[in-house]
């Protein structure tokens, strides 16, 4: 997203995690908890157009997404959720969910049936919403 000209802020509890962004990343890095409102304010949540939560944990992702959507009225909120049942529930509450479990199982199922890899967007309707 940064390379496409968007202003990007990344929040992580561990400063070492920022190494994964690569040396060319010029966005803002904030060490902190993504469900802490003071940290979110420092990151500019009050004026952001899109909020994406992609930690390793479903609970933290959904909490951060709900804070962004409900408290700060962020228009587009996207959250990575590993549990397909939870993903469906949160989607029903207006949060765009990306469920790797659903995407991967669909890809594997169809590859085993056809011998060809399909495009991931066919397995998670919310993927289409990423073109914001």
Predicted regions and their residues:
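Cytosolic regulatory regions of ion transport systems
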Residues: 1-132
């Amino acid at each position: 997203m940064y390379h496409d000209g968007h202003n990007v802020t990344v929040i992580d509890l561990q400063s070492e995690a920022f190494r994964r962004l690569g040396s060319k990343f010029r966005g803002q890095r904030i060490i902190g908890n993504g469900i802490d409102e003071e940290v979110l304010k420092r990151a500019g949540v009050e004026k952001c157009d899109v909020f994406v939560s992609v930690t390793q944990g479903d609970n933290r992702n959904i909490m951060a997404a709900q804070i962004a959507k409900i408290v700060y009225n962020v228009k587009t909120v996207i959250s990575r959720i590993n549990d397909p049942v939870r993903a469906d529930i949160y989607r029903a509450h207006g949060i765009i969910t990306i469920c790797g479990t659903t995407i991967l199982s669909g890809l594997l199922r169809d590859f085993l049936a056809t011998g060809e890899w399909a495009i991931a967007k066919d397995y998670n309707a919310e993927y289409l919403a990423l073109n914001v």
